[in-house]
From Swiss-Prot:
This is Polyhedrin. The keyword Repeat does not apply. GO terms for cellular component: viral occlusion body. Major component of the virus occlusion bodies, which are large proteinaceous structures (polyhedra), that protect the virus from the outside environment for extended periods until they are ingested by insect larvae.
Length: 245
């Protein structure tokens, strides 16, 4: 005779087919992934029109003529765990001789000339042989005119100087470009207004600190220069006429 009494120890066994059951987290993640993919595709479609244009990954190596002007070369001693101020571009007098040389001697004087960018380039070299360390740099572009920077600061989140021990800073403000029209008259009429309206209205004044990751005091040869990225316009007509042109 069968026993129909209730026994809680006897349970029931269910077999689930994984084909119809999925992890809830995987379902949600997959849905979000599909949503992000669709949004990304829509965003890419809106940028398809830019495929007809070419830009340089490094603006310094992009189109245009680089006009270099060396400001100074000198040797500085830098103690460990500190950075020394090497560029303090706070005054107009610093530019007087610089721009006189730039405009009169080496700048190609033509109308409709456009300076697309100005780079402050700092080249660093150890003066002692067989030294193994890396150069550090830190700079600021925006600060109050009354601010007086310290000559020496502690190393806090610096940047390592990259290839060829060269540190480049773009001084162009957002939007860039500095179209200089009638540069002769603008420069001749008033040097102060030329500096204020043409230079500082379009470019930042930087301050730069340099250091090393060495545990000893190091002697560094510093070369500071300005590189002007000048836009080159194509001529309206060829310079020569004939079968070859």
């Amino acid at each position: 005779m069968p026993d129909y009494s209730y026994r809680p120890t006897i349970g029931r066994t269910y077999v689930y087919d994984n084909k119809y059951y999925k992890n809830l987290g995987s379902v949600i993640k997959n849905a979000k992934r599909k949503k992000h993919l669709l949004e990304h595709q829509e965003e890419e479609k809106s940028l398809d029109g830019l495929d007809h244009y070419i830009v340089a990954e490094d603006p310094f190596l992009g189109p245009g003529k680089n006009q270099k002007l060396t400001l100074f070369k000198e040797i500085r001693n830098v103690k460990p765990d500190t950075m020394k101020l090497i560029v303090n571009w706070s005054g107009k007098e610093f530019l007087r001789e610089t721009w006189t040389r730039f405009v009169e001697d080496s700048f190609p004087i033509v109308n409709d000339q456009e300076v697309m960018d100005v780079f402050l380039v700092i080249n660093l070299r150890p003066t002692r042989p067989n030294r193994c360390y890396k150069f550090l740099a830190q700079h600021a572009l925006r600060w109050d005119c009354d601010y007086v920077p310290h000559e020496v600061i502690r190393i806090v989140e610096p940047s390592y100087v990259g290839m060829n021990n060269e540190y480049r800073i773009s001084l162009a403000k957002k939007g860039g470009g500095c179209p200089i029209m009638n540069i002769h008259s603008e420069y001749t009429n008033s040097f102060e207004s030329f500096v204020n309206r043409v230079i500082w209205e379009n470019f930042y004044k930087p301050i730069v600190y340099i250091g090393t990751d060495s545990g000893e005091e190091e002697e560094i040869l510093i070369e500071v220069s300005l590189v002007f990225k000048v836009k080159e316009f194509a001529p309206d007509a060829p310079l020569f006429t004939g079968p070859a042109y």
